[in-house]
Curated annotation (Swiss-Prot):
One of its GO terms (cellular component) is peptidoglycan-based cell wall. Pfam families: ABM (PF03992). GO terms for biological process: heme catabolic process. This is Heme oxygenase (mycobilin-producing). The record marks 66 as: Transition state stabilizer. Heme binds at residues 22-26, 75, 83-86. The gene is mhuD. Homodimer. PANTHER family: SIGNAL TRANSDUCTION PROTEIN TRAP. The keyword Heme applies. It catalyses: heme b + 3 AH2 + 3 O2 + 2 H(+) = mycobilin a + Fe(2+) + 3 A + 3 H2O; heme b + 3 AH2 + 3 O2 + 2 H(+) = mycobilin b + Fe(2+) + 3 A + 3 H2O. GO terms for molecular function: heme binding; heme oxygenase (decyclizing) activity; metal ion binding.
């Protein structure tokens, strides 16, 4: 069953552009992982201060395999000057997925 994992990242005021830059530089670090379907980095606009990294996976097993291997390796040695002050992981199963046609009236 497809799953969605959302990393809610707490970012201090003014540090958002640096977080976005770091994600842009590493956007391809996960794309070839088995079971990875895609991700979006969401910038807060109103009513929320956290950034959300929304990832889509074929299964929880695929996510766990990435999180316990390549994700750890990708972050090794990158602890200097962290941008985030905290993060929490939200986990969901996809029970309905409706795609749009992209057409306008």
């Amino acid at each position: 069953m497809p799953v969605v994992k959302i990393n809610a990242i707490e970012v201090p005021a003014g540090a958002g552009p640096e977080l976005e830059k770091r994600f842009a530089h590493r956007a391809h670090a996960v794309e070839n992982s088995p079971g990875f379907l895609g991700f979006q980095l969401l910038r807060p606009v109103k009513g929320e201060e956290r950034y959300f990294v929304v990832t889509h996976w074929e299964s929880d097993e695929a996510f766990q395999a990435w999180a316990n291997g390549p994700a750890i390796a990708a972050h090794a040695g990158h602890r200097a000057n962290p941008v985030a002050t905290g993060a929490s992981l939200l986990e969901f199963e996809v029970v309905l997925d409706v795609g749009g046609t992209g057409k306008t009236a």
